[in-house]
Amino acid sequence: MFKGSCVALITPFTEDGVNYEELRKLLEWHIKNHTDAILVCGTTGEGSTMTLEEKKEVIKFSVEVVNKRVPVIAGTGTNNTKASIELSKYAEEVGADMVLIITPYYNKTSQKGLYAHFSAINDAINIPIMLYNVPSRTGMNITPLMLDKLANLNNVVAIKEASGDLSQVAKMAELCGDRIAIYSGNDDQIVPILSLGGAGVVSVLANILPEETHNICEKYFLGEVIESRNLQLKYLSLANSLFIETNPIPVKTAMNLMNFNCGPLRLPLCEMEDSNLVILEENLKANGLIK
């Protein structure tokens, strides 16, 4: 387990594949700038538009480059239980430290089916599992009562909670906060979730402000709560601008503006609207990230 900031890393693409040279640079940059853990092939990494072979290669490559300096978390969950198991087994084989398993989307399963999905994956592997709750994308919510039940599975050790509902997070902490680590899945709720006993954040903002996102968490853990809150508020407008369109469109655009060679988005994601690009650029300039 880790405490602090886990970057939900973008995947740098070429026109027809993954830019591994740039991926290596990004991994090293994050380690240098005190990112506490690295998630690959997640939502921000455009995992849904990567082929199975691309995902396997990115996971393997990232594990090898990072070489245990920080934990590497592999986004292996899909709405297909069998496919999720296959990729999770592969991540375990190549040395990933944890897998991130999203709630199954589109299928519209029941709570019984949701539990069966996670239970089947849990029983098939021997690697820690971080659940991913993001109802706005999946149409499926992990309720506090369901999390309390899932926390009894031996490999389920954490949840990325992106419902945006702090009352729900509080109930989760009350029911099973002693058995499962809760990470904020929203950059505007890092400090509120830390105040409920959270362990950190899985962050989009960390793609462009790795050390600063780490510091929000670190200062809180050191008891410097006001300083942590002030950093949260300092970067709030910038964080919000990264969601002015569907993630990861703005953050990948921002990184290219910052002279990272992250390449194109993959369809059906496309370039930002001009009016939103102006807002993003203004926020990047205000924080000294571009001129």
UniProtKB/Swiss-Prot annotation:
The active site is at Y132, K160. Its main location: cytoplasm. One of its GO terms (biological process) is lysine biosynthetic process via diaminopimelate. It holds the Pfam family DHDPS. Pyruvate binds at T44, V202. SUPFAM superfamilies: Aldolase. Its EC number is 4.3.3.7. The record marks T43, Y106 as: Part of a proton relay during catalysis. One of its GO terms (molecular function) is 4-hydroxy-tetrahydrodipicolinate synthase activity. The keyword Lyase applies. It catalyses: L-aspartate 4-semialdehyde + pyruvate = (2S,4S)-4-hydroxy-2,3,4,5-tetrahydrodipicolinate + H2O + H(+). GO terms for cellular component: cytosol. Pathway: Amino-acid biosynthesis; L-lysine biosynthesis via DAP pathway; (S)-tetrahydrodipicolinate from L-aspartate: step 3/4. It is found in: Cytoplasm. Keywords: Amino-acid biosynthesis, Cytoplasm, Diaminopimelate biosynthesis, Lyase, Lysine biosynthesis, Schiff base. Homotetramer; dimer of dimers. Belongs to the DapA family. Catalyzes the condensation of (S)-aspartate-beta-semialdehyde [(S)-ASA] and pyruvate to 4-hydroxy-tetrahydrodipicolinate (HTPA). PANTHER family: 4-HYDROXY-2-OXOGLUTARATE ALDOLASE, MITOCHONDRIAL (PTHR12128:SF66), DIHYDRODIPICOLINATE SYNTHASE (PTHR12128). This is 4-hydroxy-tetrahydrodipicolinate synthase. It comes from Clostridium perfringens (strain SM101 / Type A). The gene is dapA.
